[in-house]
């Protein structure tokens, strides 16, 4: 499954009531670290898309989701499992560290 870009209007529908865990990647077009992290997010969406829904949300045009998830900086990650926020991370991280974080909550990583 590919990375799905969403907006404030789609946030609730795409993150709540899902059968799979949902990873939301918050980013900004002006953010250098976001550009560095993007390939890792795309790879995770490709490698685990059958078991993990991966969403991408640009922060500037979508302030409601940013406020709801208490995003204080970008890049940022939020992992939802069974409609609950179970993991948060702010700042760029390499793919191996990201997989480590996800492994704490997801048994298929």
UniProtKB/Swiss-Prot annotation:
Q: Which SUPFAM superfamilies match?
A: Thioredoxin-like
Domain Thioredoxin: residue ranges: 2-107
This protein's species is Synechocystis sp. (strain ATCC 27184 / PCC 6803 / Kazusa)
UniProt-recorded name of the protein: Thioredoxin-like protein slr1139
What are the entry keywords?
Answer: Disulfide bond, Electron transport, Redox-active center, Transport
Annotated GO biological processes are: cell redox homeostasis
Q: What domain of life is recorded for the organism?
A: Bacteria
Q: Which GO terms describe its cellular component?
A: cytoplasm; cytosol
């Amino acid at each position: 499954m590919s990375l799905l870009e969403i907006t404030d209007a789609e946030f609730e529908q795409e993150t709540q009531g899902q059968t799979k865990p949902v990873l939301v990647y918050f980013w900004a077009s002006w953010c250098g670290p976001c550009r560095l992290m993007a390939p890792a997010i795309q790879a995770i969406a490709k490698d685990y898309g059958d078991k993990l829904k991966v969403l991408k949300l640009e922060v500037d045009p979508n302030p409601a989701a940013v406020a709801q998830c208490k995003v204080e900086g970008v890049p940022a990650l939020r992992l939802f499992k069974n409609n609950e926020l179970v993991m948060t991370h702010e700042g760029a991280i390499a793919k191996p560290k990201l997989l480590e974080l996800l492994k704490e909550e997801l048994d298929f990583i």
